[in-house]
Structures are given as structure tokens and as C-alpha cells.
Amino acid sequence: MRSADERVQKRAWGTRPKGAGGVSDNHLPSEHLSPLAKLVDKVLAQVGYEMVAATDAIDDAIPGYGGLFDPTTTSGELQRALEQLLASDLSRPATSDPAGERFVLYVDGSSRGNPGPAGAGAVIMDAEEDVLARLGRPVGSRAGNNTAEYAALQLGLSELVTRYEPHRLEVRIDSMTVIQDVWGGDDPTEPGVEPYSEAVAAALASVPNHEYTHLADSDPNPADALATVGADIAAFGPG
């Protein structure tokens, strides 16, 4: 049996791309979503895509004992709760202090049906691999897995460079399609992912040194569960 080290592929430290700069907007773009899923995504954006903060706020805003994923919660109740939250003073949770200027970023995308309801997840860790942020969002109601993987990387990088000034970054990711585009210099092979690819390049421009670790399917990825919740939100309908 191969060791964990043998089951990953690593690339040497990258250098800062020339001529790139800037990061994506606070509210990240998405594929087609139902009106309800769009409202949830807006709430997520208001709290910096912190999944727990968003779902807790939504659950508290829904009357009675219902919640975001409670089958007894009607679409009307959910819509009213989301609209009330967006009209309130929602804010990002306090930013955790990192240990040093090196970071680890786990990312993952999930698509049911490929294409189907898709979500993105990302976990930001510091040099000691203490968790700083658990992020998630819906990507689209009929999006492919590769699109979700690009969206996950964009999500994690956007929040990382918004909150911190990373000097070194290790991205842990299982998508070779994204790896070959971002670090291998290949053109995107998935139709329609160019905006995500360009946003990733722009975010990486602010990180002087970065590398990737390719995760095997058997390697643990804490971003997976967040991507799954994002896909659950993307499945909200109708529309």
C-alpha cells in the first residue's frame, strides 16, 4: 500500500504571475440558480461565505422549529427569512489570527448528475493547519463538476487574499483539470470556466509563492462536506 506521501503529487513553489492583479468581488459569480438559492448565496456573501455563520443565521430567522434544510419549512417561510436577513445588519465573523504568513487551502467542488446541482467548498488553514475559515456556496442548479472545482478554488482564494496577506500558499485539490490549467499552463478545457480561471489567476497574483498538492480520492478533504451543502442549496427550487 502506498503511503500518504506517495499518493499525492507536488509541484515546486510557483512564482507570482506577471501582469495579474486584483481579486473578485465580495459577491462571487454563479451559474443559474433558483430565486431561493440566489437569496441563500447572497446571505453567504454577506458573511464572507462562512457556511456555519450563514446557516445558523438563517435557522434563527425562520419562525418556530424549522430551519434551512428542515422539510417542514415552506419556501415562503424561507424566502421571508432570507429577505429579512438581507435587510438586517449581517456582517462577516471576526477574522481569526493566523500562525505566520504561510497558509494551506483545501478546495473541492460537488455536482450531482454532472451537470446538476453543484456546490463549492473551501477550508483555509494557517501554517500549523489550524482552521481559520470554513467556506461554502451554491454554484449552479445545472453545473458540471469541473465548473464547481474552479468555483471552489476561486472561493477559497478570494476569501484568503481578502482576509490575509499570504506569502506562501499550498492548495490541496483533487481536480487535475484545474491543476493543469492553473499551474500547468494549459488552456481551460471546460466550456464557460474562463471567468473563474481568470479570477483565480488574479487572486494568485497577490501570493508571492504558491504550490499545489494533488489529493487522491482516498485522501481526506475537509472542503468536501462544505461543497455538498453548497450543492444542497443549489438544488432549492423551483426555477
Q: Can you annotate each of these PLM segments?
A:
Residues 1-94, 132-135, 164-166, 229-239:
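Intrinsically disordered, low-complexity regions
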Residues 159-226, 233:
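RNase H catalytic domain
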